[in-house]
């Protein structure tokens, strides 16, 4: 059914209070959006960081008397009689179909394709990973995932063991197995990621080759020929002593989830233990790779 969208620009400090006001006025959902489209990266644990100028967006049933809603909001102390707003009518759509239409098979490197299950496989002779958007991060659409997939495609993984540190959907571990790895290990702090990785591995016929751990379950003597960690710059720096110990001597390390502006500080945390390659960039993100000394 159609909807009415009401957008009000406020400050990050006042966004929560205004959100409550929209909910009390009948909004069925309220979302926040940066007015200037500037992303926020790596909030502190337990923190929901907002932008300086924040759009508070309320969604109302089309039958709502929006004039009455506006009259009520004008009495709110944060707004007043002359507050600025924008109203938009949202047409009725098959949102599930539109969502599915946005996902297409994607190629990474020379051999590897990531394919949603509702699309035909472009090249049956290629290495095809069947993966649908779902419970956890990682479908290949984000530049950091793409950088890691391209790197894995360029390695000879036959007979190798691979660790996917921060496995999310399991996309990197599963891709490594489909590219010839003998065994993969996925580690993630989120139990939903473990569930998603297991489900995706079963869908791709590699579940018996993938071992999954929450951090507290991880064996202390865990090592691999290849380690890939697509998380964020802060955790990559903080967890460097742990991650450095995972690759075997002569093994390979791939790090992403890093903004290009953060590459130098992350590389410094690993430079003593690895012979590092030139940094690879995609859009504003980058990938750091190297060989264990």
Curated annotation (Swiss-Prot):
Question: What processes does the entry annotate via GO biological process terms?
Answer: methylation
Pull one GO CC term from this UniProt entry. Answer: cytosol
Q: Which parts of the chain span the membrane according to its record?
A: none
User: What is catalyzed by this enzyme?
Assistant: L-lysyl-[protein] + 3 S-adenosyl-L-methionine = N(6),N(6),N(6)-trimethyl-L-lysyl-[protein] + 3 S-adenosyl-L-homocysteine + 3 H(+)
Keywords, A to Z, come to: Cytoplasm, Methyltransferase, S-adenosyl-L-methionine, Transferase
Q: Which domain of life is it from?
A: Bacteria
The primary site where this protein sits is cytoplasm
The listed locations are: Cytoplasm
- Main function: Methylates ribosomal protein L11.
What this protein is called in its record is: Ribosomal protein L11 methyltransferase
> Could you tell me which species this protein originates from?
Sodalis glossinidius (strain morsitans)
